[in-house]
């Protein structure tokens, strides 16, 4: 009952706030964020923030992921992410990790990355900013992650074993259930056939050129964004970005463009039942497909209203299902 009252109060407050805003109004931008686009198409976002003081975070987002892979390249978006820590043009071998750890940036905790279906992100967190040389090196790393990952043959072969072991470690009942669930939810689309990490046979045997081709095809400046937030001089960082990233070329006019891979609607409910002897509990999940908002609404108030309403309806459905599950 208390939760229901809280929900009503929150919805009432949200309605009052939304009444002051029109759905077609732009979402107010943070005036402290410096936004720019380089001639090669790369975007950057910079913001000064002194909490915590003396530190900053450096990110590069690539708007490409596993769904850009060809069938023969499955797992290579994730494999490429691993290779970014095995040598770049300006920091060969393990020099990147060694330099950062000497300066308090720990591999795994502060230096990391992830790959998903649609994006790949590399990050440096908790970088000390007292020494300008450390900041410059962090920017150089972002530069190298854009276009200058080494992809040395021996390093590629060494990493095969690492990733195959990662796949073996994941391969429990929960992982197998997730793969089956994602395939069912995304049935009829390219997403149905992607699991991000790939499959053992492909990881063992892919040709080095396939990895290089994926890298050069999709790691392009128009699909990349740099985000830097922390105790930094915004003007200095912006000038360094403009200078440092200038050698990243504009993509050729005939470069392949990303496709929009849609998940088709289904006229009848899709039912997927998965059983595994290693499962320790029974789980039921209900997914409801909703049309995505058109891209032109992404930066408008209506997109926030849509997200809030989705969150509340999901929470209400969750509560009701939990109540049913607790009944004798």
PLM features per residue range, with description:
Residues 1-21:
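Bacterial Sec-dependent N-terminal signal peptides
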Residues 21, 188, 225-282:
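An aromatic/glycine/proline-enriched structural segment found at the starts
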Residues 21-34, 122-125, 132, 140, ...:
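Histidine-acidic residue clusters that define the catalytic metal-binding segment
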Residues 26-61:
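Mature N-terminal segment immediately following signal peptide/propeptide cleavage
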Residues 39, 53-55, 104, 115-119, ...:
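Short, solvent-exposed loop/turn segments at the edges of secondary structure
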Residues 52-54, 62-176, 205, 210-223, ...:
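Active-site-adjacent, His/Asp/Glu-enriched structural segments that form or flank metal-binding
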Residues 162-184, 262-281, 319, 323-328:
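Short acidic/His-enriched helical or mixed secondary-structure segments at domain edges of catalytic enzymes
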Residues 255-319:
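His/Glu-based metal-binding/catalytic segments typifying zinc-dependent metallopeptidases
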